[in-house]
C-alpha cells in the first residue's frame, strides 16, 4: 500500500499459567479506505507468530478495547468473553483477572463486567470500523460501562483452537 505505514501492533506471545497466549498490548490502524485490510493483515501476523510458537496448541488471544469497533479484530476467535447473553463462569472470569494483571490494570478492574473503570489505556486496540452501522447492538451494549474519557477499557479474550490457528496463521 504505497510504502507508508497504515497500522502497527505491539504484542507478546507468552504462557500464562501454562496456557499459550497472544497479548495484543497495542494496535492502531490508520483511518483510511484500506483499514479493514490493514486490520486483517495485523491479525494474520499475530496468528502466524502464534502458530510458529505454539503449533499444536489452543491459544488465548487477549486485548483491551475502548470501543465496539475493535471486536472486528477478534471475529475469528471462539468463545469470546465477555459476550451478550452469557454469564461468565469462574474460569472465564479468572482469565479476565489474569489479563488485567498482565496489562497492569488490575487495581481498577471489575471481574463481573470485564471493565477497567479508569487508567486502563496504557495500550489498547485502536480501530474505527469503516461500517459502524453494521456493528450489532449487543456488541455495542458491552461497552455501556466503559468510560473512555476516564481511561476505561473492556478486557476481551477468546480462543483459537489449534486446527483453526493453522488456517489463520498460514501464509498462503
Where are these regions (language model features)?
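Terminal substrate-recognition subdomain of acyl/acetyltransferases
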Residues: 51-172
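Conserved glycine-rich acetyl-CoA-binding loop
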Residues: 30-41
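A conserved beta-strand-loop-helix scaffold within acyl/acetyltransferase catalytic domains
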Residues: 1-32, 50, 67
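Eukaryote-skewed repeat-based solenoidal scaffolds used as protein-protein interaction platforms
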Residues: 40-51
Amino acid at each position: 500500500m504505497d510504502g507508508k505505514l497504515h497500522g502497527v501492533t505491539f504484542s507478546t506471545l507468552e504462557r500464562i499459567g501454562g496456557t499459550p497466549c497472544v497479548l495484543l498490548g497495542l494496535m492502531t490502524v490508520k483511518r483510511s479506505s484500506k483499514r479493514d485490510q490493514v486490520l486483517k493483515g495485523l491479525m494474520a501476523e499475530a496468528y502466524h507468530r502464534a502458530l510458529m510458537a505454539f503449533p499444536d496448541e489452543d491459544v488465548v488471544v487477549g486485548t483491551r478495547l475502548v470501543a465496539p469497533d475493535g471486536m472486528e479484530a477478534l471475529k475469528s476467535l471462539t468463545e469470546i468473553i465477555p459476550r451478550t447473553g452469557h454469564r461468565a463462569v469462574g474460569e472465564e472470569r479468572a482469565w479476565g483477572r489474569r489479563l488485567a494483571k498482565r496489562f497492569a490494570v488490575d487495581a481498577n478492574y471489575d471481574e463481573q463486567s470485564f471493565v477497567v473503570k479508569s487508567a486502563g489505556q496504557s495500550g489498547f486496540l485502536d480501530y474505527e470500523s469503516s461500517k459502524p452501522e453494521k456493528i450489532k447492538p449487543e456488541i455495542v451494549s458491552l461497552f455501556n460501562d466503559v468510560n473512555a474519557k476516564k481511561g476505561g477499557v473492556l478486557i476481551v479474550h477468546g480462543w483459537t483452537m489449534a486446527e483453526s490457528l493453522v488456517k489463520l496463521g498460514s501464509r498462503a
